[in-house]
């Protein structure tokens, strides 16, 4: 099955291209960004060698849908989606922090808690919690935005301000937007029988100084979801929660001896496993959005994307 793991487009008035872990971003005339969601899969801050069919389309369509569903509370960078794998938006200067918000003790926070730590990113976590218990109120645990090949690192609000990574005035806006988006995401998830456990948001500034949401929102790559039905019973019985996230990929990697540490070999994914990951992503899409996933034509993905983007840029 065809996948798109790298692109090499040359659009009119193209100034530069930035290649992230999953997305490739083309700067058009220092005005627009054309963001292509590839089928690359990253875990533990490492890009895995194999692409996952339809993953880029799934992430792009979930993110753009949630941008539409939240634009009344938080402005965002998005202008158009000329292709299933592509979002076009305003050029922004990204803030160098990712705003992580957690409603439950899961993932990285749970691993820290299990080590006896009760503070994460300068935020105190209450005593007596079990993994996947709900926090009394959601906590914001920012990370520094790592360059490719580096690990994102936890950072406290006070350190962000002390190092002048973000001004206090801007940071208050980021915090408010983060809480508002998480609240809306929680409500939408509940309407689908899901719990939005934790998620991360990225923000940027437009040329005129407006703070906007950028990148992705409420996707399986940036968020963790649980099924709401049976959640409390599973907690009471100390059973694992049923998750909708890419945690299943992380688990598979850990079971196969890989956690992104130096010297560890990335395990090989056979075709059967790649297909199963693709199917899980489609399941995630349908559960999160509550609608059927329509597969795009992947016979020649690069050609399709190039044609659609060129058409959009010419008619703009």
Curated annotation (Swiss-Prot):
Cite the Pfam families for this sequence: SAICAR_synt
An example GO BP is: 'de novo' IMP biosynthetic process
**Any GO molecular function:** phosphoribosylaminoimidazolesuccinocarboxamide synthase activity
- Recorded catalytic activity of this chain's protein: 5-amino-1-(5-phospho-D-ribosyl)imidazole-4-carboxylate + L-aspartate + ATP = (2S)-2-[5-amino-1-(5-phospho-beta-D-ribosyl)imidazole-4-carboxamido]succinate + ADP + phosphate + 2 H(+)
Q: Which InterPro entries match?
A: SAICAR_synt/ADE2_N, SAICAR_synthetase_CS
Tell me the keywords, alphabetical order.
ATP-binding, Ligase, Nucleotide-binding, Purine biosynthesis
**Pathway involvement of the protein, from the record:** Purine metabolism; IMP biosynthesis via de novo pathway; 5-amino-1-(5-phospho-D-ribosyl)imidazole-4-carboxamide from 5-amino-1-(5-phospho-D-ribosyl)imidazole-4-carboxylate: step 1/2
CDD domains on file: SAICAR_synt_Sc
Is Metal-binding among this UniProt entry's keywords?
no
Q: What is its EC number?
A: 6.3.2.6
Q: Which superkingdom does the taxonomy of this entry point to?
A: Bacteria
Would you tell me the Gene Ontology cellular component terms?
cytoplasm
Q: PROSITE patterns given for it? A: SAICAR_SYNTHETASE_2
Q: Cite the PANTHER family for this sequence.
A: PHOSPHORIBOSYLAMINOIMIDAZOLE-SUCCINOCARBOXAMIDE SYNTHASE (PTHR43700:SF1)
Q: Which family does it belong to?
A: Belongs to the SAICAR synthetase family.
For this entry, the protein name equals Phosphoribosylaminoimidazole-succinocarboxamide synthase
């Amino acid at each position: 099955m065809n996948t798109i793991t790298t692109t090499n487009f040359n659009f009119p008035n193209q100034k530069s291209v930035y290649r992230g872990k999953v997305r490739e971003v083309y700067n058009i005339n220092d005005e627009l960004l054309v963001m292509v969601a590839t089928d690359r899969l990253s875990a533990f801050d490492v890009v895995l060698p194999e692409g996952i069919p339809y993953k880029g389309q799934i992430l792009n369509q979930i993110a753009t849908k949630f941008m539409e569903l939240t634009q009344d509370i938080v402005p965002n960078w998005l202008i158009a989606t000329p292709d299933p794998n592509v979002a076009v938006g305003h050029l922004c200067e990204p803030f160098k922090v990712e705003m992580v918000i957690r409603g439950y003790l899961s993932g990285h926070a749970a691993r820290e808690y299990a080590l006896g730590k009760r503070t994460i990113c300068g935020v105190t976590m209450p005593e007596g919690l079990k993994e996947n218990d709900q926090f009394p109120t959601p906590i914001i645990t920012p990370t520094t935005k790592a360059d490719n090949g580096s690990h994102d690192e936890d950072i406290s609000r006070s350190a962000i301000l002390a190092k002048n990574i973000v001004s206090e005035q801007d940071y208050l806006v980021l915090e408010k937007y983060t809480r508002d988006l998480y609240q809306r995401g929680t409500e939408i998830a509940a309407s689908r029988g899901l719990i939005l456990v934790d998620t991360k948001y990225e923000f940027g500034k437009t040329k005129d100084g407006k703070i906007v949401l950028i990148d992705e929102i409420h996707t399986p790559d940036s968020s963790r979801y649980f099924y709401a039905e049976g959640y409390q019973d599973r907690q009471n019985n100390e059973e694992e929660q049923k998750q909708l996230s890419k945690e299943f990929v992380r688990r598979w990697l850990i079971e196969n001896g890989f956690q992104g540490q130096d010297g560890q070999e990335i395990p090989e994914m056979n075709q059967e496993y790649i297909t199963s990951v693709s199917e899980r992503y489609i399941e995630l899409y349908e559960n999160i959005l509550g609608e059927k996933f329509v597969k795009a034509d992947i016979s020649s993905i690069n050609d399709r994307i190039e044609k659609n983007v060129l058409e959009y840029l010419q008619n703009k």
